[in-house]
């Protein structure tokens, strides 16, 4: 009866910490509703281990059970009178702490192993070499004469940066007694810092150095072909500098080499491209073609002679491949004539048949054969000074850029008809191709002698032949080389040498003194700022050769010059090779304002523009 009455009088309230029961007198106004209690009860999963989720013990069935429940065990009450956590809760906390410890240990161990692997990769895997040396200069001593200044760029050590190859005549004091021709030296300098990679002795002065891959495929090694001024033709391994083969001079007993070697398609079907050299007779103007194997250096047949009538500079030889695939050799004396490679091969082999690749003909070219059906094809005959191959836009063939004494002419390669002609005089140096206008057609920078100690630079539009930029500047160096480099936005920067622009007004007619000034400046012209020239560098010597190479990894270009210092009687001129990073020079160069522009160009705007320039390989070949 007492038990029933106790249950009937039980009211909801807060649980007393001492008795574990709800006390209606201490019950405050609770914020929780009855629904919240029900939800909490469902969320906690109901009664577990004999206790309700609200902490309320099951109701006893007798007064004894009530009395027993009112006596808390010592294990459930702390010294402060509050109940301690159950033993199962301590075990769960211990297990949770162990799991956290294991997870932390695994994470730290994984992080440590990853850091060790990163450090190992950083030390073991070589990073691509960075061109840290923005500029260097190498003194190669004194050269003992020589009229030619061959210079070539090629990557010989596989570091992704083109190296510098050049040849020079050594001092005559060091040549052997009884040698009629002074020996020369072939040197390869590192493009990174100018150190000597290798050097080889040459029996005579070198006329030309050409480095290329004669075998198709990505694994082909680079070969450097060196043509001498007399009878030397040798192939060198570009990596080691060792001679692979040398043409026997006896095959040129009746003449000497007249021009650099020319690379041909594979004629003897041995998987290596072959060569042709042009020799000229000692006493008569007979020209002789000799086909040479690119693999062994032995002749591919006998010499083939042609009698040429003409007066002037020797032109070529150069190889021209038409749209249909016909192969012709261009050459001449003051004129341009062509002969099919098929005809040379048939005569050299003394047979009537030729490889299928040589049997292709170009109808428009064949129409120009002489009336007597001669093997020679007349291309151009009007005082020719220079001949260049220029890639035609949107075509796989090239046009012919011809420099004469009176004009500059562009011939269409497909039918040999004039595209345009520009009449001018005084042009003695080779036109420099590049992109100046926005029509993606190659334009040309010209250097024309314009009075004593003055020269005129002009840019000719390759599509129309009109002059789109010109400037007159002092310069006493004869035939100073000009170059160009292509940027990623299909524009070109043009580089040329002149004296300080403050030496004379660009439009003045003042004639400077005949004494040449001692300082020459390297100027850069960008088509986006035609009224500004950038002064990049200067030298007191005479620049005899220059080349531009591209660093593909860093999108930079570098400018290599070959310079000879002033010579005096009994003291040969010093030879200096220098390299200049163009992106570095653009930031350090001085701005020279040619004329006022609207709006006025600030130096900050110019520097921001120049800092975004990136250089790429030229898509054309000359």
Swiss-Prot record:
UniProt KW keywords: Cytoplasm, Cytoskeleton, Golgi apparatus, Membrane, Phosphoprotein, Transmembrane, Transmembrane helix
Pfam families: Beta-prop_FAM234A_B
SUPFAM superfamilies xref list: Quinoprotein alcohol dehydrogenase-like
Location in or out of the cell: Membrane; Golgi outpost; Cytoplasm, Cytoskeleton, Microtubule organizing center
Region (Disordered): 1-68
GO cellular component: Golgi apparatus; membrane; microtubule organizing center
Stretches that traverse the bilayer: 104-124
Residue(s) carrying Phosphoserine: 16, 30, 33, 62
Topology with respect to the bilayer: Single-pass membrane protein
Principal place of residence: membrane
Residue positions, PTM Phosphothreonine: 26
Similarity section: Belongs to the FAM234 family.
Protein known as: Protein FAM234B
